[in-house]
From Swiss-Prot:
Main location: secreted
Glycosylation site residues: 26, 237, 346
Similarity-based family: Belongs to the NXPE family.
Source taxon at top rank: Eukaryota
Electron transport keyword on record: no
Signal peptide: 1-30
Protein name: NXPE family member 3
GO cellular component terms listed in the entry, alphabetical order: extracellular region
Location of this chain's protein in the cell: Secreted
Keywords annotated in UniProt: Glycoprotein, Secreted, Signal
SUPFAM superfamilies from the UniProt entry: E set domains (SSF81296)
Pfam families in the cross-refs: Neurexophilin (PF06312), NXPE4_C (PF24536)
Amino acid sequence: MWTNFFKLRLFCCLLAVLMVVVLVVNVTQVEYLDHETVSATFIDSSGQFVSSQVTGISRNPYCGYDQQTLSSQERMEEDSLLAALHQQVPDVGPVPFVKSTDPSSSYFVILNSAAFFKVGSQLEVLVHVQDFQRKPKKYGGDYLQARIHSPKLQAGAVGRVVDYQNGFYKVFFTLLWPGKVKVSVSLVHPSEGIRVLQRLQEDKPDRVYFKSLFRSGRISETTECNVCLPGNLPLCNFTDLYTGEPWFCFKPKKLPCSSRITHFKGGYLKGLLTAAESAFFQSGVNIKMPINSSGPDWVTVIPRRIKETNNLELSQGSGTFPSGYYYKDQWRPRKFKMRQFNDPDNITECLQRKVVHLFGDSTIRQWFEYLTTFVPDLVEFNLGSPKNVGPFLAVDQKHNILLKYRCHGPPIRFTTVFSNELHYVANELNGIVGGKNTVVAIAVWSRFSTFPLEVYIRRLRNIRRAVVRLLDRSPKTVVVIRTANAQELGPEVSLFNSDWYNFQLDTILRRMFSGVGVYLVDAWEMTLAHYLPHKLHPDEVIVKNQLDMFLSFVCPLET
């Protein structure tokens, strides 16, 4: 009897242990399955957020910018933007280096250069490009930059380039100051190089790659992350639930996706070009090289009479080009009077009782750095944030000024950012009440140059929605957009941050925010028109002019 009872008790114990083991295995499987779930949030035609989930391991390459549901109006807008930019590059097949554009044998001619021009007159320049065999080219697609300038006056303005797709270009300038005015034209990239840049933009969105650190206890793993990940490995999906902005990381082998703690730039892919393609990207040969004039490269401009000057100012419409010009190193917008904030007290008076939000990349972080350096009463609080990353905060308690900076969400090329600090601008805007004492400035462009244009269009679409909502609930909120700017280029930098890429982004930004009710700081023209070398982070004199323009929107001259 006791023997049977002992056997029954042993059997029950074994059964209980077995049930516990099965339960643990099932819980583990459920947790593992949950971390492998690939989910995405899309936007339907009504503008509402629609969430979809696919349970299981993603085995196919996933590019988040392809997974969009757009309204018919959004689709038309995107198609129009892409068509306008893509048609600039002719498809002529492979071209040997000797038949590519040679800036040293190309030339420009000032039309009617012997005539005297008045301030406000149009100046036309004809550019003829030739190859390295000194033969005229029969197609266009070269990326040119042009400006007029008077060094002694520290004056400058940009020109509008028109490509006739036959090897000839025209540059149109508006002469905006009197005196001797010189013309400068540069070849940024030959059309053959532009075709390579376009291929990289479409086929190599991962040429700048990112990583994340995952950690749990003593176990840590690092995996690659991006908007688009190649291969068949399982993914962690970090797509934003509110905006639908896609972001993915390869799943760690041992850790769950929820253990991600940091985001950082991994590096730049090498070996992107063939030997033949590399010839189109040579410093001192065909990257940002001057094109010389055939004949005079300057004209004489005489002042207008006072009555003519008043008529000229009245005739300037909303589509004024250029938007402004430098004179004595001060930017002069053509559509309104810009104030000069030369004294810290002027800035303090303007920003008194205001909350200023700066969102975006490192080019708008320069604004935060300038203000906290120039205005002594703006005291920066140490939030323990990583250098150059943020978030940053400065306060002037006496005058009730609050200044904030926060970087935009991925892709962001900073060294290390805690994953919980990766905030999308659209989400931040949705949390702002707004009002007459609220100022918002946004600069989102420099980290999108390596991606297909659809990625940038999507980001701006989300930001635009949030801006419209903010202005609807608080119409007196001041919203300012800082545009892209030109920068220094070399053979390698051109493949990632070319001015041609940034010109595309700048064009998209201007069109998408046209008519929205925001102010524009034209950093693009303010960089190109200045005599200083181009830099991603412009020198202080240019930043100062940007801030003067920004503050003039916040505190305009009383009329």
